[in-house]
Amino acid sequence: MSVTDGRQAFPAPAKLNLDLRITGRREDGYHNIESIFCLIDLQDTVYLKPRDDGKIILHNPVDGMPQEADLSYRAASLLQKYARTPTGVEIWLDKKIPTGAGLGGGSSDAATVLLVLNRWWQCGLTQRQLIDSGAALGADVPFFIFGKNAFARGIGDRLDEMDIPKQWYVIVKPPVHVSTAKIFTHEGLTRNSASSIMPTFQNLQPFRNDMQAVVFKEYPEVWKAYSELSRYGFALMTGSGACVFTACQDRNSAYNIYRQVSDLYEAYLAEGLSKHPLLSV
């Protein structure tokens, strides 16, 4: 990765949930899900610089949030206890993934910090150990550590690689922030979808998102964005929202849709990835 003023830059890609079903509520209050997770090339950049004094410093936390509450800071703090030498790190986040969007930006940043510092600090954690550690930070973190398109079960921590056709995506971000906690506690949320017997990309179609109906009811702006995007093809919400997306087989088709919707909404044109960029490093 590139080096600037002693800082090294590492990618943190976004994700889309191409299908998301809630199969039950757990005794601990969390929900069991089944979902297709797909990596896309919309990404943040995480800049890291080693320190030898044991301090962890996040230089640009989200406005109003103490650095200790940021997932990237928490990831570094969590991993520090496994380090073989007393070392610290400075963190800068160049955010391109919108927040509160269902694209996993904060979780991806945290996963990138875990993956890089596991090597830098010679922690020696296996991928499974990193996934288990990442699950304590957020439900999407395990997927980004797994690093490949996947079918997820449990709370998102049981992952199996899934082949997903090469696609382009048009993503629309309505002007609203969806509260994930509000959606998961909503009395109208579907929580009893049947578990998949043979989960493949083809077998799970037509895709759906069990949270979509509740979000549309509580956040009309998401419904409006979905309705607009549905004019051009099959649209779906990712995660708990607020972003909605449609898939295309080629870039030209996606770009034509992007040109139309970007006049009305914050919009993104993204290409699907087969694996996390850090797996190539």
Swiss-Prot record:
Active site: K15, D140
Protein name (database record): 4-diphosphocytidyl-2-C-methyl-D-erythritol kinase
Sequence positions that bind ATP: P98, T99, G100, A101, G102, L103, G104, G105, G106, S107, S108
Catalytic activity: 4-CDP-2-C-methyl-D-erythritol + ATP = 4-CDP-2-C-methyl-D-erythritol 2-phosphate + ADP + H(+)
Single biological process term from Gene Ontology: terpenoid biosynthetic process
Keyword terms, alphabetized: ATP-binding, Isoprene biosynthesis, Kinase, Nucleotide-binding, Transferase
GO molecular function, one term: ATP binding
Record-linked HAMAP family: IspE (MF_00061)
EC code(s) of this entry: 2.7.1.148
Pfam family, one: GHMP_kinases_C
Enzyme's top EC category: transferase
InterPro entries: GHMP_kinase_C_dom, GHMP_kinase_C_sf, GHMP_kinase_N_dom, IspE, Ribosomal_Su5_D2-typ_SF, Ribsml_uS5_D2-typ_fold_subgr
Pathway where it operates: Isoprenoid biosynthesis; isopentenyl diphosphate biosynthesis via DXP pathway; isopentenyl diphosphate from 1-deoxy-D-xylulose 5-phosphate: step 3/6
Its biological purpose: Catalyzes the phosphorylation of the position 2 hydroxy group of 4-diphosphocytidyl-2C-methyl-D-erythritol.
Source superkingdom: Bacteria
Family: Belongs to the GHMP kinase family. IspE subfamily.
